[in-house]
């Protein structure tokens, strides 16, 4: 289904808050997994919603993708082999493939229609689909890591939607344990970790669960204006304590001229943890 008339395109949060942009619906369909909507907004350009939740848009997406990708890729011991779970819009792999050190990226996306429609409509976001280092696999990322060989990836990035529908299994301990097994020594796992304002309980649970699986798990924070509350978070986990604080200078020097937001100062500031998050974690631990 497609339509031309400008409309207000809203994400309704818990039937009490709306986040909306005015624009046109370019395409809408229901795949075997979810409702997919492609829009052209007046403020942020073309974008994607899944099950009526904002995922990305051309003039907003760097706020999300740069934060997910660059803290782990500047700090991992090696970045030769990277696994991306989700990320069918192509923005995450675009950022990963900025690094010359990266030799192979495997993108595992459960919904092939997200990839196809993103390639058709969101070319300004997914600019790296033709990179020969990229392998796109349509399938279940949870099942993929269950059967992946031990120590086969240097970095794992989880670019999933909220913990519902096809992404629900990306938020449990068994999945995190498989990711840890699949990582090489010195490897890094990172995932989007919801809004500490709008989804605090989920955010705290993710930190707690990842902290039980990895030697260290640290949340980091930024802004994504089109997401609920605008305040967003990601989680960095590894078995090397303090690794998150040590971006490699050569990688920083190579990446900073290429990107819009990420730099050394942003990296350090992002890991500052709000007091209410600290208190929430302490309360959960008894």
From Swiss-Prot:
Per the record, GO CC terms? cytoplasm
Residue span(s) of domain PABS: 6-239
* Compartment list: Cytoplasm
Which residues participate in S-methyl-5'-thioadenosine binding?
34, 109, 140-141, 166
Q: Which pathway does this polypeptide act in?
A: Amine and polyamine biosynthesis; spermidine biosynthesis; spermidine from putrescine: step 1/1
Q: What GO molecular-function term can you cite, just one?
A: spermidine synthase activity
Q: Name the domain of life this protein comes from.
A: Bacteria
Reaction equations catalysed: S-adenosyl 3-(methylsulfanyl)propylamine + putrescine = S-methyl-5'-thioadenosine + spermidine + H(+)
Mind telling me which Gene3D superfamilies this protein's record contains? Spermidine synthase, tetramerisation domain, Vaccinia Virus protein VP39
The record's Gene Ontology biological-process terms are: spermidine biosynthetic process
Transmembrane intervals: none
- Write out the catalytic residues in the record: 159 (proton acceptor)
Q: Which residues form a coiled coil?
A: none
Alphabetized, the UniProt keywords read: Cytoplasm, Polyamine biosynthesis, Spermidine biosynthesis, Transferase
- Record text on subunit structure and interactions: Homodimer or homotetramer. Homodimer.
Among NCBIfam families, the record links this protein to:
PRK00811.1
Q: Which family does it belong to?
A: Belongs to the spermidine/spermine synthase family.
Q: What does this protein do?
A: Catalyzes the irreversible transfer of a propylamine group from the amino donor S-adenosylmethioninamine (decarboxy-AdoMet) to putrescine (1,4-diaminobutane) to yield spermidine.
What protein am I looking at? Polyamine aminopropyltransferase
User: What organism does the record attribute this protein to?
Assistant: Synechococcus elongatus (strain ATCC 33912 / PCC 7942 / FACHB-805)
Which lineage do the record's taxonomy fields give for this organism?
Bacteria, Bacillati, Cyanobacteriota, Cyanophyceae, Synechococcales
């Amino acid at each position: 289904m497609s339509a031309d008339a400008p409309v207000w395109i809203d994400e309704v949060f818990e039937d009490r808050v709306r986040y909306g942009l005015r624009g046109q619906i370019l395409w809408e369909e229901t795949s075997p997994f979810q409702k997919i909507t492609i829009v052209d907004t007046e403020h942020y350009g073309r974008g994607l919603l899944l099950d009526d939740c904002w995922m990305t848009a051309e003039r907003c997406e760097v706020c999300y993708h740069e934060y997910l990708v660059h803290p782990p890729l500047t700090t991992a011991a090696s970045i030769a082999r990277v696994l991306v779970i989700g990320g069918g819009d192509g923005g995450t792999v675009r950022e990963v493939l900025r690094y010359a050190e990266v030799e192979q990226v495997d993108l595992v996306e459960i919904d092939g229609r997200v990839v196809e429609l993103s390639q058709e409509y969101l070319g300004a976001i997914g600019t790296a689909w033709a990179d020969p280092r990229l392998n796109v696999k349509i399938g279940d990322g949870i099942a993929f890591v269950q059967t992946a060989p031990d120590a086969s990836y240097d970095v794992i990035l989880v670019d999933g939607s909220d913990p519902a529908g096809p992404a629900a299994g990306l938020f449990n301990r068994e999945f995190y344990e498989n990711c840890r097994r699949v990582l090489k020594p010195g490897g890094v796992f990172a995932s989007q970790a919801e809004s500490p304002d709008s989804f605090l309980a989920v955010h705290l649970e993710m930190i707690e669960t990842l902290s039980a699986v990895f030697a260290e798990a640290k949340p980091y924070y930024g802004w994504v204006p089109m997401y609920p509350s605008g305040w967003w978070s990601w989680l960095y986990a590894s078995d090397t304590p303090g690794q998150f604080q040590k971006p490699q200078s050569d990688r920083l020097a190579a990446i900073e001229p290429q990107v819009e937001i990420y730099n050394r100062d942003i990296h350090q500031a992002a890991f500052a943890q709000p007091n209410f998050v600290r208190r929430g974690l302490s309360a959960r631990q008894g």
